[in-house]
Amino acid sequence: MKYIVMQDVFFIVLLLVLAVPLGIYMYKVMIGEKVFLSRVLEPVERFGYRLMGVNAAGMSAKRYAGSVLAFSAVGFIFVMAVLMLQGFLPLNPEGMKGLSFSLAFNTAASFVSNTNWQAYSGEAALSYFSQSIGLTVQNFVSAATGIAVLFAVIRGFIWKKQKTVGNFWQDLFRVTLYILLPLSLVLAILLVSQGVVQSFADYSVVESLENGAKQLIPLGPAASQIAIKQLGTNGGGFFGANSAFPFENPSSFTNLLEMLAILLIPVALVVMFGRAVKDSKQGRAIMTAMMIVFVVGVVAITISEQFAGPSYQGVTTSGSMEGKEVRFGVGGSSLFAASTTAASNGAVNAMHDSLTPLGGLVPMFFMQLGEVIFGGVGSGLYGMIGFIILTVFIAGLLVGRTPEYLGKKIEPYDMKMVCLLILVPPLLTLFGTAVAVMMPSVQASVSASGAHGFSEVLYAFTSMGNNNGSAFAGFAADTTFTNMVGAVMMLLARFIPLIAALYLAQNMAGKSPVAASSGTLSTKNGMFIGLLIGVVVLVGALSFLPALALGPIADFFTTFK
């Protein structure tokens, strides 16, 4: 246990050390200031703008949102076409056939929405072309879209009397070129150096050492996709077993790299926010709130897995190793599970369906909080800003003052947008789960009975309704109902809050800041951090406690038998 604690502390310290300079760098990218890569990348940037015909003029929230939707729609159609026609496309040495309409629809929606929910196994269903040209490209642009929208939201708080929130095409291009591509290149090289596969060769047929039986070894350009899948909080694995598969994550060192990559940009964006609003204490307050909830979650998962359930007492001293890789152990698996669900990533290095009931409850609850504990790149922070505004609003009601945040008054229109930001994911999750449990096809998809079977369904629709993408693997997801309903849920969960955030940003940008007074609520002290954590957890608890009581909590009490 001491080793696990040291490992977790080392990880968090290293994460913060790396995130601070990256956050400062991203702030410079956001405002268009020169960075150390400018000499190399500025000519590429100018050429890209000319090629795309980009006009640098500012956009209103309506035009910005329209550009996001149009760009995403084109990506959706392209990915769906590639997946359905992959049998006729190049880079298909294994002769993979095109996906069915429902599965292609679900997969396209999943990757365009930055969810990366996978109802297929990559090495058995997709060609190299589909993986690299279809899905990897979406991993870049869906992540860049989230960060671009966050840039727009931040401008809403720092601009005065403006009717625009920035230019989507410029934001998208700069995020991709200056942030995601360089980081992905470095991480991909590190992963390849540690044994992660990167090849366009045919699958290999080898004889096993044990009995001489023939075995098919899948290959592919995995490292390049894994780099952006983690950095962009995408999470979709090149192989079906995701980061539990040795070709994706062969050692403890690559496990550390991938966990750092999952949280690096979300944490750095909080640093960037503090720099952008000219008050680092605001960023530190948000970081502290996120980190407290994250650490509590890590501790809860680790204890649940290390000491298992009451019925297992005295049976094992190494903790619950079911569904875990020996090279990662309980500590590495628990930290990865917390990171991937706190950050809206969804990659796994252990099977979440095999976690103990309380160990599985924590990742599920992290998602049900709205993916705001670090959350997805961009989307996590603008979701947390929604919770901050809600907290300020509640505090204002308590003391009878007009609520303010960063000098901008919070008005009824702002609260309507915040409600859309906060309430859409839980409504989609609960509605989807309620409908699903009544469908015979979903009931047949569940591998377990009772409370754990319900947990599998709840986890699946929580994952899709909050754009995470991880799953309890006992849930067979490739059915027409789950594919179609899940796809609609993922798209709505992505784009309704995104559009609400943009309209919130425009309304804020049009306001004049008001001077702080003695009655202004401080949003950077310990009291506010406690209030913020309370609001985030309370909204999640009120929304999901009845469902959790029927699932993982009831499942936990079965371990007393």
Curated annotation (Swiss-Prot):
Keyword flag Metal-binding: no
Protein name listed in UniProt: Potassium-transporting ATPase potassium-binding subunit
Major localization class: membrane
Annotated transmembrane regions: 4-24, 65-85, 133-153, 177-197, 253-273, 285-305, 380-400, 417-437, 484-504, 528-548
Record PANTHER family: POTASSIUM-TRANSPORTING ATPASE A CHAIN (PTHR30607), POTASSIUM-TRANSPORTING ATPASE POTASSIUM-BINDING SUBUNIT (PTHR30607:SF2)
Name of the gene encoding the protein in the UniProt record: kdpA
Subunit structure: The system is composed of three essential subunits: KdpA, KdpB and KdpC.
Compartment(s): Cell membrane
Highest rank taxon of the organism: Bacteria
Xref: InterPro entries: KdpA
GO cellular component: plasma membrane
Gene Ontology terms for molecular function: P-type potassium transmembrane transporter activity; potassium ion binding
Annotated family: Belongs to the KdpA family.
Coiled coil stretches, renumbered: none
Keywords: Cell membrane, Ion transport, Membrane, Potassium, Potassium transport, Transmembrane, Transmembrane helix, Transport
Function: Part of the high-affinity ATP-driven potassium transport (or Kdp) system, which catalyzes the hydrolysis of ATP coupled with the electrogenic transport of potassium into the cytoplasm. This subunit binds the extracellular potassium ions and delivers the ions to the membrane domain of KdpB through an intramembrane tunnel.
Organism of this sequence: Listeria innocua serovar 6a (strain ATCC BAA-680 / CLIP 11262)
Topological type in the membrane: Multi-pass membrane protein
